[in-house]
Amino acid sequence: MREFIVDEARAWIKTPYRHQGRVKGVGVDCAGLPICVARNLGLVGYEFDVSGYGRVPDGASLVAACDKWMTRIDLPELGSVIVVRFRPE
């Protein structure tokens, strides 16, 4: 299954950034990519999504959504989702 996840994610490579986008080839953002990959592989339904978030991360919403729908692991594996937290300079 992990190989299918990677293959589907790679199919989105040329999709431009679009805030809250969810359409391959049209636009997607960093939250939408894992959502759409999982949805396209039949791993989740449309309830597995978030919306209404701002362009500037608040530092908690994305982490809370990931904790709700995913299981944390110590070391990343093929197909893992990595969450990066930015700090204002």
Predicted regions and their residues:
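Active-site nucleophilic cysteine motif
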Residues: R22-L41
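A broad structural signal for alpha-helix termini and local helix breaks/kinks
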Residues: I13, L41-G42
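...with weaker cross-activation on analogous glycine-rich loops/strands in unrelated enzymes
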Residues: E3-V6, Y46-E89
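Generic hydrophobic/packing signal
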Residues: Q20, L41, S80-I82
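Surface-exposed loop/turn and secondary-structure junction residues enriched for glycine/proline
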Residues: T15-P16, Q20, A31, Y53-V56, ...
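Active-site nucleophile-His-acid catalytic modules used for acyl/amide transfer and hydrolysis
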Residues: V6-G27, E47-F48
